[in-house]
Curated annotation (Swiss-Prot):
It comes from the Bacteria. It comes from Colwellia psychrerythraea (strain 34H / ATCC BAA-681) (Vibrio psychroerythus). It catalyses: L-threonine + hydrogencarbonate + ATP = L-threonylcarbamoyladenylate + diphosphate + H2O. This is Threonylcarbamoyl-AMP synthase. Belongs to the SUA5 family. TsaC subfamily.
C-alpha cells in the first residue's frame, strides 16, 4: 500500500475501500460531512441507520463518544472486548454529525487489529468510518478483487490488503446493557 496516497485520499475527503476483520469496508473521514453524504449515496444507505467508526485505539474514538456516560465497570468490559471484531454501541458526543449516528443516541464503534486500518488511523490520528463494501441489501466483498464494479469505480482509493479471515461481519453489542443487536 502507498501510505501517502491513502492518507492523502482520506484527508481530501475521499472514499476508501479497505479490509476489515471479515469483509471489505468503505469509509471516509468522520469529520467530513461531504464525504459522509457521498458515502451514504454510494451505498444507497439511509442516513437514519448510522455508520460504524473503526479505530486503532480508544483515544481515537474519544472525540466522537460521550465517555462520561460510560460507568467505569462498563468501560472495563467495553475495552476487554477489543480488538476482537466486536462493534459496540456507546453514548455519542452530541456534537457529532447525525450522518454518523443516524437517528440514535449512541454511535457504533470498534477497535480493530487489521494492520492497514490501524496504520491509517495512526497516521491520521482519527478513526475511519466503516460500512460494508456493497450496495445496501447485497453481499459484501471479501477481497479487493471482488469489489462491485460500480463501487470500485466510485471510490478514491482501494487499500489492497487482506481481511483478518473472519467469516461473518462483526457482532454488535450495546456496551451499557450488554444486549446483542447483531450476532
Amino acid at each position: 500500500m502507498s501510505e501517502k496516497n491513502v492518507v492523502e485520499a482520506f484527508k481530501n475527503g475521499g472514499i476508501i475501500a479497505y479490509p476489515t476483520e471479515a469483509v471489505f469496508g468503505l469509509g471516509c473521514d468522520p469529520d467530513n460531512k461531504e464525504a459522509l453524504k457521498r458515502l451514504l449515496k454510494l451505498k444507497q444507505r439511509s442516513p437514519e441507520k448510522g455508520l460504524i467508526l473503526l479505530a486503532g485505539s480508544y483515544s481515537q474514538l474519544l472525540p466522537y463518544i460521550d465517555d462520561s456516560k460510560i460507568p467505569q465497570d462498563k468501560r472495563l468490559t467495553l475495552l476487554s472486548r477489543w480488538p476482537d471484531g466486536i462493534t459496540q454501541l456507546v453514548p455519542k458526543n452530541n456534537n457529532i454529525s447525525s450522518l454518523l449516528s443516524g437517528s440514535f443516541d449512541t454511535i457504533a464503534v470498534r477497535i480493530t487489529s487489521q494492520p492497514d486500518v490501524v496504520a491509517l488511523c495512526q497516521q491520521t490520528n482519527k478513526p475511519i468510518v466503516s460500512t460494508s463494501a456493497n450496495l445496501s441489501g447485497q453481499e459484501p466483498a471479501k477481497t479487493w478483487q471482488s469489489l462491485d464494479l460500480v463501487l470500485s469505480k466510485q471510490v478514491d482509493f482501494i487499500l489492497k490488503g487482506v481481511t483478518l479471515g473472519r467469516t461473518s461481519p462483526s457482532k454488535i453489542i450495546d456496551a451499557l446493557t450488554g444486549k446483542i443487536i447483531r450476532n
